């Protein structure tokens, strides 16, 4: 349940799909078990789409993508209680996210997860959308279900030839 008294960090998420309809996911440095789609905070005064494109470049190391859709409403999730004190100095109890569906227009060699000095991911792969939730960290599974529900028909209608 979402409490009006708690503060949620504004964030964007990116569901990047390739020409086969598979989704980009990365394995974070702080996890050996879970994979996630790129996401990150929105800077003060930054437009949501601008933030999504910046996060794509920072985390995936590419700008070879075009925005296809944006979800309609904020999606909220709470961090586990034990994680709150170590994330963002305990300021937020979770995140509120707006998600962007992006079509990858490049080749795999155009992806560089080591683009920044502090990469988010140690590995990456293309994941079938049907298996996406199973690879996610438990507290993000409901978010991923909502994102898939909103975007999967668009992805299926957008699979393109090489």
UniProtKB/Swiss-Prot annotation:
EC number, UniProt record: 3.6.1.-
Signal sequence residues: none
Spans traversing the lipid bilayer: none
Alphabetized InterPro entries for the sequence: Nudix_hydrolase, NUDIX_hydrolase-like_dom_sf, NUDIX_hydrolase_CS, NUDIX_hydrolase_dom, RppH
Domain Nudix hydrolase: 7-149
Keywords associated with the record: Hydrolase
Top-level taxon of the source organism: Bacteria
Intervals of motif Nudix box: 40-61
Single GO molecular function: guanosine-3',5'-bis(diphosphate) 3'-diphosphatase activity
One protein family per Pfam: NUDIX
Cofactor list: a divalent metal cation
One example of a Gene Ontology biological process annotation: ribose phosphate metabolic process
Its biological purpose: Accelerates the degradation of transcripts by removing pyrophosphate from the 5'-end of triphosphorylated RNA, leading to a more labile monophosphorylated state that can stimulate subsequent ribonuclease cleavage.
UniProt-listed PANTHER family: NUDIX HYDROLASE 26, CHLOROPLASTIC (PTHR11839:SF22), UDP/ADP-SUGAR PYROPHOSPHATASE (PTHR11839)
Family the entry assigns: Belongs to the Nudix hydrolase family. RppH subfamily.
Classification via HAMAP family: Nudix_RppH
Protein name: RNA pyrophosphohydrolase
Protein's gene: rppH
């Amino acid at each position: 349940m979402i409490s009006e008294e708690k503060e949620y960090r504004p964030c964007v998420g990116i569901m990047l799909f390739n020409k086969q309809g598979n989704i980009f996911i990365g394995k974070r440095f702080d996890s050996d078990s879970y994979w996630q789609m790129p996401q990150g905070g929105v800077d003060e005064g930054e437009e949501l789409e601008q933030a999504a494109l910046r996060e794509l470049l920072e985390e995936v190391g590419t700008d070879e993508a075009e925005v296809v859709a944006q979800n309609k409403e904020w999606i909220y999730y709470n961090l586990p209680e034990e994680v709150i004190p170590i994330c963002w100095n305990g300021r937020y109890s979770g995140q509120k996210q707006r998600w962007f569906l992006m079509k990858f227009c490049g080749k795999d060699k155009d992806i560089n997860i080591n683009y920044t000095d502090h990469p988010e991911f140690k590995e990456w792969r293309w994941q079938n959308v049907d298996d996406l939730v199973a690879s996610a960290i438990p507290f993000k599974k409901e978010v991923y279900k909502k994102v898939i529900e909103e975007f999967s028909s668009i992805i299926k209608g957008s699979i393109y030839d090489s």
